[in-house]
Design a protein with these regions (language model features):
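Metal-dependent amide/peptide-bond hydrolase catalytic core
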Residues: 80-203
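Histidine/acidic-residue-rich, glycine-tolerant segments that coordinate divalent metal ions
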Residues: 1-107, 111-118, 201
Length: 203
């Protein structure tokens, strides 16, 4: 039995680095344990099949033309363009994926002063899905939303979608074995069935 303490389950991804260091040499089966503040102490939640979603990221920059705030007619205002994108992006992604993914815009940045329209505006976020086809559909829908708004306003854009890890899908046989073992340790009454969720983990 080998205990492994993995860092960075999202974003940079600690699992691959540990594998490359040889941590899984001569290992037949790996079982992950994730701390959950919503689970009561002494209880274990477990689920076979789909459990954690793929945690993809996206980032975009809208490239317009700055101007003095008193002369907006001389600008290609990236903030106005970004506002339109943010208004449409959720409904476009939901429509393209039939409401089967979670997409959240988590950061928005633009401007430095109160009287100057900036040249650029940027935003980024995450897409969570249990299906690789839906991941691609979300990617396309996000870029199409950006492209449409920028072309209409005469702006340019840069866009990057980062495909991180596939969904975490637990093996049924290993899950059943884990449940039997856990029952001996904490009692059958303390083994709960977990719900699949949109968190991510590269385990």
């Amino acid at each position: 039995v080998r205990f492994i303490f993995q860092p960075a389950e999202e974003e940079t991804g600690g699992a691959l680095d540990m594998i490359n260091e040889g941590v899984l040499k001569n290992v037949d089966t790996a079982v992950g344990l994730h701390v959950d503040p919503e689970t009561e102490t002494g209880k274990i939640t477990v689920k076979d099949g789909e459990f954690f979603a793929s945690p993809d990221f996206f980032n975009a920059e809208i490239i317009g033309k700055g101007s003095h705030g008193a002369q907006p007619q001389n600008a290609v205002d990236p903030i106005k363009i970004l506002t339109e994108i943010l208004f449409n992006i959720h409904k476009n992604v939901d429509s393209a994926t039939e409401n089967e993914v979670v997409m959240s815009v988590c950061k928005v940045n633009s401007g430095f002063s109160e009287n100057s329209i900036p040249d650029t505006a940027s935003f980024g976020g995450t897409v969570r899905a249990f299906d690789n086809v839906l991941r691609k559909k979300a990617d396309i829908a996000i870029e199409e939303t950006i492209k449409t708004a920028c072309e209409k306003a005469g702006a340019k854009y840069e866009y990057k979608y980062t495909y991180l890890y596939p969904p975490l899908i637990n093996d049924k046989n290993v899950t059943e074995l884990l449940i039997k073992s856990a029952e001996k340790a904490v009692g059958k009454e303390n083994i709960l069935t977990a719900e699949k969720n949109m968190l991510g983990d590269d385990f």
